[in-house]
Every structure is written in structure tokens, then in C-alpha cells.
Regions:
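Short Gly/charged-rich anion-binding patches and loops
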Residues: 4, 75, 241-242
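Acidic/His-leaning functional-site neighborhoods
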Residues: 154-251
Length: 264
């Protein structure tokens, strides 16, 4: 087994078999979502986000940090490739909470071809991310551990939607065109540096739970969800409380001496 797989499996506490099949893909997808938190801390500090294999491994795996889509799906793609899955990254346009005009391609997701079927995997869309792969099939409701999703085909584009309290809400749209590393670098740079990017203005964290719940942090507001409903909400009174939640609830390996956040 390669070093990255040893380190990654230790990171997500995985001791199962690693056969190239849909059961392995589902299990790794959920384990990843429940262990490696979505977070944008480096954008706010600010620290440049590097997308090369070594940087992603050192940050998300060795240093026990999280990241956003370019990092999360970058690591997951590498792991699947090391396991000999047929996988490649795609780029999508986020339409959730965006104006009607089409935004640039700033979301990284994965296409996995397995057992003569195509699957979409995505461990990097924050609180609404998939926690299981779904088939690349149009207008089929597909259940994951954290809710129902569907894909709609519109010409060459696909639109991913999630069921939000019985209302279908679009998340992002994408096509199956081949992308290059430079495309991910460009999307990452835009997401981290565009003045209106929400990653530049809000601290965002999410970790999914194996029982179908999830934990979120938006600035100093912490929420615990079960079955899509908030069962605990609290405003953190100070930076010390924020640091504690980062470590205790999100398992974030952060050197607090290197982080400076203003009091609320």
C-alpha cells in the first residue's frame, strides 16, 4: 500500500477492504465527509491554498486540517486513483445562493466510472455536499445518508439538486468536459481572491455525522442538525470558545498560536 493510502486510511480511521467497487466508494465517501471537515480558514487568514499533491496531503491528511472543494476533492481523487478507480475531476458553476447570471467554474467534483456506470462523487460542497456517490442519470431521486438528491440533464449540462424540505433546490451545474490542473488553479484563485467571494467574508465549517446529522459553523454561530432540523444552536461568546469548537466538534488540527481572529 502506498504512503498516501496509509496516511489517508489512518486519517479517516478506515480498516475495511479497499476493493474497486461501489461499496468501497460509498464507504470512503461517507468516512471522508464525517472526518475531514469542510473549512475555509486559510482564505481568511490569509494563506495561499496550494493544490499540488504534497501540499494537499500535508494539510488535510497529515496536519488534520480541512479545506474546500478544490482541496477536498483533490485529495479524494488522488486516493481513488491510488486504489485504481477510474476517476477524474470536473468543474461546475455554483448556482445555489448566486445571482441568475452564470458564475464561473469554481466547484470541483468527481466523475467515477465503475462497473459500466458513471457516478458523481463530491466531498467538497460544504453543508449540502453529497455524502454518497450518485449515478449519472437524469431525473432519478437518489437517497444518500444525508438526504435526497437528483440530477437533471439540460443539453450537455447536468444540474445537481437537493430536496430541501420537499422543495428541489439547484446546487451547481456542470458538464463532462476534460479539465486541466491549470483550470483548478484558476478556479481556486478566484474563489480565494475575488472580493465578493463569500469565502473571503465568512468563516465556514461543516462536518457530517454518521447518523445523518451534521455540524456547521458560520462565523461564531454553531449549529447541530438532525434530520435536516436544528437541534442545537449557540452563539459562541469569544475566540476561546471558537477555538474549542474547532477542535472538539470539527476535529481541526490547528496551531492556535498562528491564528488571529477578532472577537465577535
Amino acid at each position: 500500500m502506498t504512503p498516501i493510502l496509509n496516511h489517508y486510511f489512518a486519517r479517516i480511521n478506515w480498516s475495511g477492504a479497499a476493493a474497486v467497487n461501489i461499496d468501497t466508494l460509498r464507504a470512503l465517501h461517507l468516512k471522508h465527509n464525517c472526518t475531514i471537515p469542510f473549512e475555509n480558514l486559510d482564505v481568511l487568514l490569509p494563506r495561499e491554498i496550494q493544490l499540488d499533491d504534497q501540499s494537499l496531503e500535508e494539510k488535510l491528511v497529515i496536519a488534520r486540517r480541512g479545506g474546500y472543494c478544490f482541496e477536498q476533492n483533490g485529495v479524494f481523487e488522488r486516493v481513488l486513483r491510488e486504489l485504481e478507480f477510474n476517476v477524474r475531476s470536473l468543474l461546475g458553476r455554483v448556482v445555489l445562493s448566486n445571482p441568475p447570471a452564470l458564475p464561473p467554474r469554481t466547484h470541483r467534483l468527481l466523475l467515477v466510472e465503475l462497473e459500466e456506470e458513471k457516478w458523481i462523487a463530491d466531498v467538497g460542497f460544504g453543508g449540502q455536499t453529497l455524502t454518497a456517490p450518485i449515478r449519472l442519470v437524469s431525473d432519478l431521486v437518489q437517497t444518500t445518508p444525508h438526504g435526497d438528491y437528483r440530477l437533471l440533464q439540460e443539453g450537455d449540462d447536468w444540474v445537481l439538486q437537493f430536496n430541501h424540505h420537499q422543495h428541489w433546490q439547484s446546487m451547481y451545474r456542470f458538464d463532462l468536459c476534460e479539465q486541466q490542473q491549470s483550470d483548478y488553479v484558476m478556479g481556486n484563485f478566484w474563489s480565494a481572491h475575488w472580493p465578493q467571494s463569500h469565502f473571503r467574508h465568512h468563516l465556514l465549517m461543516c462536518r457530517h455525522l454518521p447518523d445523518g446529522g451534521k455540524l456547521t459553523l458560520t462565523n461564531f454561530h454553531f449549529t447541530h442538525y438532525e434530520n435536516g432540523h436544528a437541534v442545537e444552536q449557540r452563539n459562541l461568546p469569544d475566540v476561546a470558545s471558537l477555538y474549542a469548537v474547532m477542535q472538539e466538534q470539527f476535529g481541526l488540527g490547528v496551531d492556535l498560536s498562528l491564528i488571529h481572529i477578532s472577537e465577535p
